[in-house]
Regions:
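N-terminal leader/targeting and accessory segments in enzymes
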Residues: 1-89, 93
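Phosphate-binding loop of NTP-binding sites
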Residues: 86-157
Length: 157
């Protein structure tokens, strides 16, 4: 497995300064690096052409299964072992470590997580955002995310 700094150095050697990273082709913005790896429900490598069409300047992909890079695709690319595990740390670095300036509370359990998070956010003296089943944002002004827990690349953006 490469380190985040090694990945960034490889991108820089190719002349690529990443504006951001995305592991969902629908969220790729021009200048992003697309991270393509097998997921729980879908294989992100199937969406590489879509990510490039949306402006991805490079693709980092994980080998395995019957996947092979299509040489007709013109984006800079390289294979990375353990890419999914590196997605969060890579996003953290590319976006300037945004979570380091936050106080975080995690709520776990079988039932009541949404209720508890809303109670905490409402009772907190300062601005307090929540992420969960109902969406992400501030109490009363939540944006639907479609996910209970967004991927790290989405959270860091």
């Amino acid at each position: 497995m490469s380190s985040v700094l090694e990945l960034l150095a490889r991108l820089k050697a190719l002349g690529i300064q990443s504006a951001g990273v995305a592991d969902d082709s629908r969220q790729v913005q021009p200048g992003d690096v697309f991270l393509a790896y097998p997921g729980d429900l879908a294989d992100g490598r199937r969406y590489i052409p879509d990510a490039i069409a949306r402006g991805a300047v490079a693709v980092l992909w994980q080998a395995g299964g019957d996947f092979a890079w299509n040489p007709a695709l013109t984006a800079a690319n390289f294979q990375v072992d353990g890419l999914r595990a590196l997605a969060g740390p890579l996003a953290h670095t590319v976006y300037g470590a945004p979570s380091e300036g936050l106080s975080l509370i995690a709520i776990t359990g079988t039932n009541g997580k949404t209720t508890v998070s809303q109670f905490i956010a409402s009772a907190h003296a300062g601005r307090c955002a929540v992420i969960g089943t109902l969406g992400a944002g501030f109490p009363g002004v939540l944006e639907e995310t479609g996910f209970t827990t967004p991927e790290a690349t989405t959270l860091m953006r």
